[in-house]
């Protein structure tokens, strides 16, 4: 920088301004003169001044003569008061430039600059070290330094010449004391910090008021290079350069750039009046004032200064051993501190908060949105350094490292760790670099030379490598000798000789080297999307990584730890050629993650942080084998570092062959991990690799079935990945016992890298630990249960025993948690039990055949019983305790509700989902309105239904009139709408009295045919029958017979008349009867046979039925016991009737139908292009498929299927259009055709016409892509016929024509929701359909998924503005228990950022998803995901986020509980309180007749 300028070194050497005339006289003369002259002056200063008293020195001549004496007096020994008086006089006189006093001679006051310049030169004599009275000299020196500080700070009269003399004075006194080797306890050691502090402070003041010329800067740089063996020099330099950097960043990048905060004490070093240009110039010059800080790693360079050379030769002229200088033992720590200072500067330019060990941590303030701009270079172009190195870098000789060397005692303790990562706390995510940070090339142009040189300090490279001088260590012959002697010393020598410790050996420069490596890693990890880095920098960086990650020959633990700590996002930055170092990182991870103790790293770093960073790197490596397949990675140097020419590492390896190594690392990490955060990250990675493997194999199978061949897709089973390269890596790298990973590998040796093998390994590992190590940890348990739920959805065929193992482990976990002592029961514990029941439901719905096994069914039902009642009926060998004998005592109502939901799932959903009506609704798509509309009887209305309630939990709506469908009209039928806790179900029931065949083949109620009678009855004989036999007439009469007279004997005339009348009447009657008999016989002969009048026939069948009464009676609901009020209970009877005529009844029934049967979630998807910051810019991106990447549309299709909002019976993303079964018209099909012909992009899924939808048996999700309000309407009206051949357009017809999975039960003829379909979600929120009740739907979590083309734009995502666009209407419902407040913090809104990489993989950033139970899986911050698994993992993460939010909510009630509460409310409001006779009477009455007009 100052090569064309001459140093002032010769000027300083030739300057005799510090000598006096008295130096020409004998010492005794000078001492006596000085004592005599100085004493009166000093005594006058010590006494109070009297007004009017005259100064002893009046003329210029007197003053100058006295100053000659004082100059000599400053060289005297400190045994008397002379030197003190001299110092007092001079420190008083130099204040003439600040505030003149009476004690100052008048000539000095008149010409202060001239005299002060002379005084400063004289004061140099005070700082010459003396052999005795060191404390007195230190005190006097401090007095002078304080006076100098005051002079520089407060003087406004100093001329440039005085400033220059002052700077030279400070340089000279620093050089006098600091240039020689440090003597322990000497004056230099005590004054070093103050000396260098005053020098830098005064220099900064001079820059403000009188900027030093280049010769002064060059002189300062040369002199400071001679003082670097003092720790204080580097410390003070670091403070000054950090303070300057803080000011520089403030005006260079503006207030939006993260402020680099430094302690107030350091910031005060920079004068407030220093302008920006001065700050920039001063900063760059101060940066280079320390020369090359890498020199600090070479004792030979540090000891080659003139002052060292003076002591390097002893009296006899023989060279002294270099390691005899005790001050050199501080070089490793000084080197580290210099690297730490540079590291802080780099972090400041990157905008990363990184705590410093020496002062308050610099923390960034709010990062406001600023436009992206090019980095401002503070280096003048003509001064920018292009050199590779500033000192000689001879090739280092290869030498073996002794045992004592390898087992050296570490000089750092864990309490003062030399390494630190930007993420110091486990709960806070790593800070992102500032969006407006400089480019990587700019930072490397400024700091790269130093950092790369420091990163290769004392590295030993293989002889076969073509070494560049810029890549090797700094060496000289003397330093080689130093290292040779140090490395050959035995351990006994190090321990017995207190003059040596571990920090005297070159390997202890590892701390500084590690700091440089970590800084470079952070620089390259801060690469912006699309940024180009010079190949020279990339090659050196990869060389650094390969060197730092070596584990075969020599492991440098600090460097290895630093690289790992600072490289988590390294494989997420699209660095060109980064895959070259993948094998080396894998080898490093094999050293770190399976090691439980990490004892070799504990003295350097926090093991938990090291493991976390290793896991982050592992997360970014896992998709590579599947993604690149058989692509070969060139292994550059691994074999050469091992000195084994036959090593298999020299051979190129395929990425697929690394899969087994990565899986084993993952398994080993899970077995040894104890930190909850790290464990959850591993669990998320397990689901990622299992699902990716399953999808890849499924694609491979499809291609094989289709006849296609693809080497990159079908290799999973043919190439197991066990190659010579991967096989060698499984050997233990530590002398400990065999790692668990190898033991597990033996258990699953066959197909261990297949999807089925991975799934089995994952289930075994997770279930084993869930009921052992993890069951006490809530966060890990929850993540493990989420992993098991995800594994249940992986479509891979595994043995039923493995699936049963998962179900059994969840049951065992529930039993353990429920059986814990009462004092340990808490809401969090019950949340875990609820989560376990939810996991159990997932497994049962995904694998319903598991309940075909008796043992599994018994275990599951016992767990349900335990959750509902609090105990099992049978425990071990105890007697069975029946339900009626048990007193219900569940762990909590939440647990009971979860168990009831599980029971409902078992009884109603298993094997019945999805129903023929589709997955959009587990309920029947039928209600009263639908039945009325399609009934054939016009008299049917809503009052034609009878409403009953069973057991206070099920509402029955019975329609007795037939519907006119396929039901047989001859049999009694009833249509029942069953509204229970699980939803609304419609049953059409018919009383079946005959088998199905009899209905078709037999005539009902027709008797069997009879034979025709014969009219020929044979001959008829007329025989007169006598009442008595003939013998009666022959019997003679006796006297008694004659005692009764005959009739004529006693009849008188009057009686005769009457007798005759009677006789004639009888004759007439007989004739009439004979006539009738004849007539009857004639008619009888005319009739057919059989006589229909007299023939016996069966009664005709009933035509009108009261089927509701029959239904209730047949099911036993009409017993007297069912109608009685239960004793000692407030519950209603088992059967009650509801009065549907009470106003508001049907509104409440509709309200009940709107209560969802499953949890519902909403995801809003945004697309963010580079540089965008406003919500309108982001919303407009989805208006055309040409403005988004093709993978984005593919991603949308992987989330769910397209549904029409007007026809969809499930959740649509807004309450105004959800769960409706009567809201579509026939005109929508024509509109669909218009939409299909236009390029409206993903905005079709904005919730106006369509949304993306996903549902399973337990949850439903709506994926909404918000767009501007007018986008869809404009596209329909414009009729633009632009048919450009764009690749993205090919995807849209598939999206729009995708068949809906919902079943259209009936064609709908109701009016469409025109008002809501042309409004954005935020506008629809304020326009709900009139008359439609909206129930309080409880807690709602709105998850946002953001596709960002440029990763740095995450900082600019306007989440607060877009909150208005992600309304679902739930937050506006009345009495909503968790309606979103206007004060909702942005950090509480879960956001999943997806950034596509150039490799075709995707980088994940999670924001706001960390809740009470820590992070959510499977997606983890920093994870890399493949195209295949992206949709599944995002969807699963959304489900888990929302489930966790519901678990954390104090007011959340499951859907079945809310429905049960509403049913109870309906019963209480509309119960028909009738007496038993009245109830029975009402059953025989017709319903609906009096309300036909309504």
UniProtKB/Swiss-Prot annotation:
Phosphoprotein in keyword set: yes
InterPro entries: RALGAPB, Rap/Ran-GAP_sf, Rap/Ran_GAP_dom, RGPA/RALGAPB_N
Phosphothreonine PTM sites in chain numbering: 363, 379, 734
Any matching Pfam family: RALGAPB_N
Tissue/organ expression: Highly expressed in brain, mostly in amygdala.
Keyword Methyltransferase carried by entry: no
Protein name: Ral GTPase-activating protein subunit beta
